Amino acid sequence: MDKYAVFGNPIKHSKSPFIHTLFARQTMQDLEYSAIEAPINGFVESVTAFFSQQGKGCNVTVPFKEEAFQFADQLTERAKLAGAVNTLKKLDDGIILGDNTDGEGLVQDLLQYQVPLEDKHILLIGAGGAARGVILPLLKQNPASITLVNRTYEKAKQLAELFSPYGRIEAKEMSDINKGFDVIINSTSASLSGELPQIDPVIFSGGAISYDMMYGSGKTIFNQWALENDAYQAYDGLGMLVGQAAESFTVWRGLRPGSKQILRELRKNLEGM
C-alpha cells in the first residue's frame, strides 16, 4: 500500500487525513495517509525518514513550507514563484519534486462558486506566504488587474515587482484605496484573532465577491464585515483547503478526485451537525 502523509507542527487538528482517505475511496486508490508531527528543528530528518521508508508523497503545512522548498531536488514553476512548497512527490528516479497547490486550490474554489475572474479587478489583502502562493494561478485567469495591499507597503511592492512579468499587478498603500473591486481576497490570518484590515470598506461597494482564506464554524469576521458593506457574496477558505488537497492528490496519482461531497462533509463537521 502506498504511503502518504502531512507534516506540520502542530498537526493533530489537520483535516488532510480525512480528506485524502475519502479521495482514495472515491477514486479506488489503494493508499494510506497519516499525519506526522515533525519536531520544529527536525523537519528534514522526519521527511527524509518518511521517503526512505517507501513514502510516495506528502503535504507540508506550517511552519515547514519554506524548509520543504529548500529540501526539494526539483521545483515546479508555481512552487518557485511561491517560494514555498506544500506538496512533495518522490519521482520514479528517486528525485523529490516540490510543488505548491495552494493557488490552484483557491482558483478552483472560486470557479466552483462561479466567481468570474477574467477581466475582473481583484484586490488581494496581505503579502505573506499565503498571498505569494496564489498570485500566479490568479494571474493565469487573465484578470483586468490585481491590486496588492499590506500593512507594510514595501512587502506588497516587492511581491508586485516579482510577479509583474506574468500579468497586470500593482501594489498600493491601504490608505490610498478608495474604490470598489470585483473580487476581494483576504490572505491574512486576521480573522482568527477577530481583527479586520485597516482599509476603507468602500472596497466592497457595488456588489463585490469577498473571499477569506480563513474558515470557522460560522462566517468569519472579515466576511461579516464584507456583507455589512454591500458585498454581494462571501466565501471562506474551506473549499480552498479541499481544492489544494485535490490538486496534490492529482500530482501524486494522476487522477482528479471530486471535491463537492467532501466539502459538504467537512462543513457538516465544522458546524457540529
Curated annotation (Swiss-Prot):
Coiled-coil blocks: none
Catalytic residues identified in the record: K65 (proton acceptor)
UniProt pathway: Metabolic intermediate biosynthesis; chorismate biosynthesis; chorismate from D-erythrose 4-phosphate and phosphoenolpyruvate: step 4/7
Origin: domain of life: Bacteria
InterPro entries, per the entry: Aminoacid_DH-like_N_sf, NAD(P)-bd_dom_sf, SDH_C, Shikimate_DH, Shikimate_DH-bd_N, Shikimate_DH_fam, Shikm_DH/Glu-tRNA_Rdtase
Reactions catalysed: shikimate + NADP(+) = 3-dehydroshikimate + NADPH + H(+)
Annotated CDD domains: NAD_bind_Shikimate_DH (cd01065)
S-S bridge residues: none
Single GO cellular component term: cytosol
Family to which the UniProt record says this protein belongs: Belongs to the shikimate dehydrogenase family.
Function comment: Involved in the biosynthesis of the chorismate, which leads to the biosynthesis of aromatic amino acids. Catalyzes the reversible NADPH linked reduction of 3-dehydroshikimate (DHSA) to yield shikimate (SA).
Subunit comment: Homodimer.
Protein name per the record: Shikimate dehydrogenase (NADP(+))
Organism this protein belongs to: Aliivibrio fischeri (strain MJ11)
